[in-house]
Amino acid sequence: MKEYILIAGVNGTGKSSFRGVLEGQGVPLGHIVDPDLIAKQNNFNELAAGKQAVREIQNCLKNGETVTQETTLSSHQVRKSIIKAKEQGYRIVMYYIGLNTKYESIYRIANRVRKGGHDIPPDDVIRRFTHRFEALDRIVPLCDKVIFYDNDNGFVKVAEITDGTFRYTNGYRPDWIVEYHHNKQTEQ
């Protein structure tokens, strides 16, 4: 079955590293769309890389190919692409990578820059971190399955949502997933 796979999380949570884990496990990811990699390979700024990423996703959907997108979920274009994919019979799977604090994300980005990687302004990270649950609220209802991983000290699966039902997958419950789940229960 064709899938639209999202590897999502705030900047610095380890999305690209997690993609490597999935590849190592032999998970079929299809065409991978990574705006950061597009920017680096083509010497594009963030806006141009984002536009190229949208074109690549649209081409995959048009051709019925499985596609994997790395995303912070901060763009409304992600939601539009998911809706289009659902209309075309795609199964939507999201892997969400979380951390407890924005400072951990900022620290990891600074470490990445020291190693020659790309930078993200701290204000952008703070804004995305602050609004991460709102972003999830826009996307989760469109997904067939959501798997939540904590990356405080390596990737640990902490929860999943299948067919709209949330469940913890083990006893490890980092603050961010407890807060997200509590907010969802309070809204119901």
Where in the sequence are the language-model features?
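Structural recognition of the conserved hydrophobic beta-strand(s) that form the central parallel beta-sheet
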Residues: 7, 67-71
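P-loop (Walker A) phosphate-binding loop of NTP-binding proteins
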Residues: 10
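Conserved glycine(s) of the Walker
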Residues: 14
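Pre-Walker A (Motif I) flank of P-loop NTPase domains
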Residues: 1-5, 63-65
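NTP-dependent small-molecule kinase module
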Residues: 140-188
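Conserved substrate/cofactor phosphate-moiety recognition/catalytic segment
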Residues: 17-67
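Short, glycine/charged-enriched secondary-structure capping and boundary segments
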Residues: 21-23, 47-48, 82-85, 108-111, ...
